[in-house]
Amino acid sequence: MSYVIDRRLNGKNKSTVNRQRFLRRYREHIKKAVEEAVSRRSITDMEHGEQISIPGRDIDEPVLHHGRGGRQTVVHPGNKEFTAGEHIARPSGGGGGRGGGKASNSGEGMDDFVFQITQEEFLDFMFEDLELPNLVKRHITGTDTFKTIRAGISNDGNPSRINIVRTLRSAHARRIALSGGSRAKLRAALKELERIRREEPDNLGDIQELELEIAKLRARIDRVPFLDTFDLKYNLLVKQPNPTSKAVMFCLMDVSGSMTQATKDIAKRFFILLYLFLKRNYEKIEVVFIRHHTSAREVDEEEFFYSRETGGTIVSSALKMMQEIMAERYPTHEWNIYAAQASDGDNWNDDSPVCRDILLKQIMPFVQYYTYVEITPREHQALWFEYERVREAFEDSFAQQQIVSASDIYPVFRELFQRRLVA
């Protein structure tokens, strides 16, 4: 059997359609392989795709053929041993049994089909069927809102928006183009007139003729208008629609002393996965990072993931800071507000009821969705049970899950952000 191996790097995307059809056909195999890869690889290791293996039996095409066994009559072409009309004795044992399993120097088989998916395809399967719940349009006034932005230069426009520099530049270029030949002839005539006056001052006929030609050339140049309507350039202003759905995600991470290094690593991996999901699936979304121990602080992305600061545990400090930022920068009638909190569940005992009250009264009525992830192999503590009371009050917009080990990150993430069916 012959095989053709095509090593072209998909020149001009000629095979893209076939590749997409193949990915759709074996979607379940690929999704399973991607889920296994996510649990096996680091969340930060997303700079390459994944090698997918599909069992050979699953890519076989169904074909119609004669079954084994039974009595069949077949006509064969003749050869040097048999001539037309002769009958060949039927072999004994017409059934199709199985071999004894010993090694043989003949026979064929089929290996698993292995291929590589790209980083883009890997992330597509990784975040398939995930979304931010309850994302709705905010600040609806019956019309879209716009902002005016500059969009270059136009040949038409309002006189108040004329661009003087570009207009004069265009006029100067036009004058040079239209009078360039006449100016060259004028320079030559002036040079010749100067020569004749210097060398042949008595040659009045040529001098008079050159003076007449020079006057005609100057008149021709002067007839080129200094400014023409063709030269006018205007600043072009266009209206750009503002997004009607604005969203912000608050990321609250516990970095207190009770969080072991392994627990902090799991929390960081969860937030890296969340951040990757948001930036890939939502073009316009803001992310607010808050780290907390006994006090909370808003930080940038770099400090959120890599700072080594630690301390005691007062979870309510992060919730209070979130509420303050919401009130200051994100009006609830304009923004879809989301939050994701990760902690090991350890908290100062008197602070857990405070967290519950802040959520119930100051945060949950104004957010679209709030997720709490507790990273611990131990039994739940007071904070978990206080949050359960919040979940009872806001069943559709509050979710809590437990992560025991790194292998739980991706399944829990999918559970929290699984696309919901709308009745």
Curated annotation (Swiss-Prot):
Family under the similarity heading: Belongs to the UPF0229 family.
InterPro entries: UPF0229
NCBIfam families in UniProt: PRK05325.1-2, PRK05325.1-3
Region (Disordered): 84-107
Pfam families: DUF444 (PF04285)
Record-given protein name: UPF0229 protein PSPA7_0730
Organism annotation: Pseudomonas paraeruginosa (strain DSM 24068 / PA7)
Gly residues compositional bias, start-end: 92-102
